Amino acid sequence: MKNLYLFLSIFILTISTSFADGHNIKKDGFLSKKFKVTKLSIIEDPTNKIILINNHGQSNFDGKQNFCTSIDQIRNRVSLIDEEINGKKIMLYNLCAHKIVGDMGKKWWFSKKPYEGKSKLDKRVEQNLELVEKLVSLGVPRKQIFVTGHSCGGLTTLLFFSRHPDKAGGGIAYMQACFDRLSKKYKVSKLGLEEGLARFKEKKPAQYDLRSQYNDEILKNLKVPLLAFTHPKDPFEGLTSDWLDQIDGMKRVVISKDYTIDGKKCFKLGKNKSDKFKVKDGHSMDQATCFQYYNPVILEYIGSRI
């Protein structure tokens, strides 16, 4: 038994070390094809650039986390760098929010108190607006700036356009979610949407109310045509995302029914060639290399907005 514990400890340490060696991305800036980060300064020929702002996910609802994203998570966004649409070249800006803390903090998730003040999501929306205005001041046309995001970053994207519809050209939400594994934890597949959400409300009434508040705001105010990707096996909001179809102009793409796209098995790739993992969670399907099958859909959407 001791030998087993020793083996597991060494195995975990080895994996942690390999990932820590440049795998995680901890700072803002423009990304290169080789995942190098360059600080925002002067943008060469800004009128002929398309800027995609990447909003990462979160490890908790309202608190800090150790890093903002990682190579495997952002690889597909990086694959769009230098693509040209109508003579305009795509750039990718990684926007880190890992140090932002909501007014009620990390412990609120375990509380039944109604949320008071600005949540981390609210502050991330403001952070995006500040960056958009900075890019515009550097000469990038507003219509050529796109707010995008995965998970909590995807929900940030939807909230951004419900509050600031004219500030950017468009947005892409990947697996929007920020309220835990609703689909899986509350057995939506077995019990149905209504019963699943009722159980969520019973267990976490304050969190249920804030999610409902955000969803209602988006349904009421979002008028900008956006692109959204979801997957039915996403344990977070995979089976609780049909409300997106009620939004006029929303193009929702249900990626697939399993862990393949166009008949190909899906893998995530890290920094090294050996960092190759099968996708076993629908929440990560937009991060698997097979998802690049949808790059033409993304490029077509961007082209329709500039």
Regions found by a protein language model. Give the residues of each.
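N-terminal cap/lid segment of alpha/beta-hydrolase-fold proteins
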Residues: 21-45
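Short, surface-exposed "cap/lid" segments of acyl-processing enzymes
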Residues: 43-85
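Active-site-adjacent alpha-helix of alpha/beta-hydrolase-fold enzymes
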Residues: 69-81, 230-273
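Cap/lid segment of the alpha/beta-hydrolase catalytic domain
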Residues: 92-122
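Alpha/beta-hydrolase active-site loop
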Residues: 112-138
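Primarily recognizes the serine-hydrolase "nucleophile elbow" in alpha/beta-hydrolase
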Residues: 134-136, 143-191
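The feature captures the conserved acid-bearing segment of alpha/beta-hydrolase catalytic domains
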Residues: 178-255
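C-terminal catalytic histidine-bearing segment of alpha/beta-hydrolase fold enzymes
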Residues: 251-306
